[in-house]
Amino acid sequence: MLDGPSAKQPWNINIHYDALLESRVPLDARRVLDVGCGDGFLAARLARRVSDVTALDSDAPVLQRARNRFATAPIKWVHGDVMSAEFPGAGCGASDAVGAFDAVVSNAALHHVGDTRAALQRLARLVAPGGTLAVVTFVKPSFRNGLWHLTSWVACGAVNRIKGKWEHTAPVKWPPPDTLRQLRGHVRGLLPDARVRRLLFGRVLISWRAPD
């Protein structure tokens, strides 16, 4: 178990960005969805201050390990595909889950979905009016952003050696389906007010606030 007060927090670059995603969750949020929760560290972090956290993952063994790791955390663990999942306690199925969550977050999972545009549309529909969507994801390397990709690759190697990388148990998918330019195009077409920002370590942050 890693949910006890004396448990040491593992580290990798995905876990590093959990704090950034948590900072995008409104302080008064009551219901939060973590999409592609993987090993469960972000969901557990959110559960410390949010009363109703749902953690969704399509990989059953990974989800079970997360459930075991954070057995005492008040989290609803859901196995399923975000495009069709039903959410317990929301009083809604896949077709009528519009606006069910005050915040929807996702860390290093969006690139696992084949259709990025459809996935972003689905995530945005799950956000309640005035709520937030925050996604950290990867993009496909491109010549246009070659310097950023190279710098990120060097930085990743250095920080992993210094801090000691904890290997996650979730499946790896590479390369991502979209370049940064393509991802920005998807976001601009669906969520005109959203921001897409490059991060160090080769990640991208998508942040959006739903209209009231």
Spans of features found by a protein language model:
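A short glycine-rich, Lys/Arg-flanked "PGG" loop and its adjoining helix->strand segment in the class I
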Residues: 118-129
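Conserved beta-strand signature within the Rossmann-like core of class I S-adenosyl-L-methionine
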Residues: 131-137
